[in-house]
Curated annotation (Swiss-Prot):
Stated name of the protein: Probable alpha,alpha-trehalose-phosphate synthase [UDP-forming] 9
Coiled coil: none
Enzyme class: transferase
Lineage of the organism: Eukaryota, Viridiplantae, Streptophyta, Embryophyta, Tracheophyta
Phosphoserine modified-residue sites: 5
PANTHER family: ALPHA,ALPHA-TREHALOSE-PHOSPHATE SYNTHASE [UDP-FORMING] 9-RELATED, TREHALOSE-6-PHOSPHATE SYNTHASE
Modified residues (Phosphothreonine): 32
Catalytic activity reported: D-glucose 6-phosphate + UDP-alpha-D-glucose = alpha,alpha-trehalose 6-phosphate + UDP + H(+)
CDD domains assigned: GT20_TPS (cd03788), HAD_TPP (cd01627)
EC number: 2.4.1.15
GO biological process: trehalose biosynthetic process
Top-level taxon of origin: Eukaryota
InterPro entries named in the record: Glyco_trans_20, HAD-like_sf, HAD-SF_hydro_IIB, HAD_sf, Trehalose_PPase
Annotated spans, Glycosyltransferase: 59-546
The organism of origin for this protein: Arabidopsis thaliana (Mouse-ear cress)
Amino acid sequence: MVSRSCANFLDLASWDLLDFPQTQRALPRVMTVPGIISELDGGYSDGSSDVNSSNSSRERKIIVANMLPLQAKRDTETGQWCFSWDEDSLLLQLRDGFSSDTEFVYIGSLNADIGISEQEEVSHKLLLDFNCVPTFLPKEMQEKFYLGFCKHHLWPLFHYMLPMFPDHGDRFDRRLWQAYVSANKIFSDRVMEVINPEEDYVWIHDYHLMVLPTFLRKRFNRIKLGFFLHSPFPSSEIYRTLPVRDDLLRGLLNCDLIGFHTFDYARHFLSCCSRMLGLDYESKRGHIGLDYFGRTVFIKILPVGIHMGRLESVLNLPSTAAKMKEIQEQFKGKKLILGVDDMDIFKGISLKLIAMERLFETYWHMRGKLVLIQIVNPARATGKDVEEAKKETYSTAKRINERYGSAGYQPVILIDRLVPRYEKTAYYAMADCCLVNAVRDGMNLVPYKYIICRQGTPGMDKAMGISHDSARTSMLVVSEFIGCSPSLSGAIRVNPWDVDAVAEAVNLALTMGETEKRLRHEKHYHYVSTHDVGYWAKSFMQDLERACREHYNKRCWGIGFGLSFRVLSLSPSFRKLSIDHIVSTYRNTQRRAIFLDYDGTLVPESSIIKTPNAEVLSVLKSLCGDPKNTVFVVSGRGWESLSDWLSPCENLGIAAEHGYFIRWSSKKEWETCYSSAEAEWKTMVEPVMRSYMDATDGSTIEYKESALVWHHQDADPDFGACQAKELLDHLESVLANEPVVVKRGQHIVEVKPQGVSKGLAVEKVIHQMVEDGNPPDMVMCIGDDRSDEDMFESILSTVTNPDLPMPPEIFACTVGRKPSKAKYFLDDVSDVLKLLGGLAAATSSSKPEYQQQSSSLHTQVAFESII
């Protein structure tokens, strides 16, 4: 079996991919095509090596991440590779949230350089022993993918570092982006080799694989796909600087569920989708959802937890108790503050040390009684920034120790080595306060670990001679900019840049009364112990299952090329309107009602010229000339404009301002059900709208005879939407006793009389036709926007109208392939005019003319021919 990956980004768009050598595996391959799911042939050389050979009823989760939850080392005697589970890996720990019947398949890279000649053997061993499928990236690609794009571009940007610093020069390197895309493609190939798309759930982790969902969704339109981002997501002003911003957003939107640690991260993501892709979101029954081409992409907000059992087992080790006694003796009579951080520019270690220096300056009584133990984990990245951060950390610690230290006393102790787990746990358990001062961090589980270690275990209590009923306390000083901060309501939150405030917070934590310390600890322990990693994983998967329930109730097909690919999901009955079918019905009916929207239906929405061209007028005149037809243009535009533009069509009916004004032909007078006295509400609405217009730059007010409309499409997207919501609430309150309705639409808030809509206008026309003894036996309605959905709903309800002698043939058609109440669609205005031209030709006696025109349209006639 051969895996395929991109050589460059242009190749990606054409899907002309280079070959990479890959492990031979006897695994089945399945795929879906639009509307159909089928299984392709896949050889089974050995059932024992088949990941899919387990009981088909057994739940299976495919976990995809950059690194597998494995530790690898080569046996020095045999030269063979040996593997074991990495017990500290979140990917392994999340299994606690599921039953023992759940099968897990892991896909990712190894933290070891496996030679090409050994890759097949290693792959087979990992599949048999661990249910793991390794991805082997070529060395150059791995460096460009991980150290290049992930650590050089995404990681700094997601932590709010803009690519505008002089020492970085031209920060964006497209070759690194191409490697990122190619690596994600290789990951997708591994998933495709093992997945059963009808049954399996795929859970992708973190920013390394943000375009992987696009590759998987392209191959399996109905794949059950979740993604969790373990880093921060920056504000739209930061994120929009990324040249490939849209591709990454679309990648995530090809998932069914996207998870974030905090609402702030989710809010920034939603803002980016709104500002850059024009997408709206709404909350239904507590779940946030984005409508994306007929699919609802749900947003999950839940911080990850820790593995309680793993930490408690370390607390019970004799080596941990021995280290705790050593720490107790070494720092007897002193208060311990603990910091545990990676050595990088975002963990704020130097700011923490400066705050400690300020503490000793301000609170002189703390001198000689306080020790900061700072454990420095090895840096995950390399570079000039990391070296400068390390240099500053050591110089600051040295300065503090020289100024405030003494013989046998160091106020700052840096432990810059690989610290064993038992030793780190002992420091957690003995520290009086934990200080986490990161300037930006996705989650940071250090506070959670500290809380659990301070609670202790019966085994630890016995070893340390502590009474089991003794009060437990813990104090946390945490940065406002880390993901766990919102969930720790009892912690003292600080701005890490304000070193004076941090110093004051540490002093407060150390001098706080024991009762309050105990109450804060109990509150934190209850939360952390009930929201562990198992709870987090189970909750995410439950929401993913809920998000995928509608997969097989809709018709799906893919649109777009390369990384712009997305799936359009619509009703199974939704199809392209066949010219042949409607013309046949048209000829066999005697009374027809035809309703047409104006903007976006007869005239392109994007056109600056809004007057109808000669072709539109000719088609309308021809249709209106048939005495069997009642033709109406139903629009939100004013009656004066429509009357002027459509004046050549004398027999054309017009419903202006969404049906507030109706005229049956140019020879008739305009009708309305409302008098000018009933419009007194305008004097109440206009001042309110004007105040919002003045306060919202870019907004305008449209004055109609029947309505007032506040537009905010040219305002800031977020601020405009916020103002629109507030204006809606304000007007609903002011107009509660007035005979009007307040509606919020696409970038508008509109106030109009009750009973005014395109749907009611259509009902009025059909009712009048019935009263005149000419009930329609065919009704056709074509429109393109939200207001036209009222028309579609109205004509579909006419089927059950008891006033009609028999149900008419109904053709509700929207312009553009998008979710709609209509049963049919046409692609664009050009298709609409071709359809109307076909009907006009059928009306005339020149049958050959229609046949000639119809044959030219046959290539895009029936939706079924596409399937």
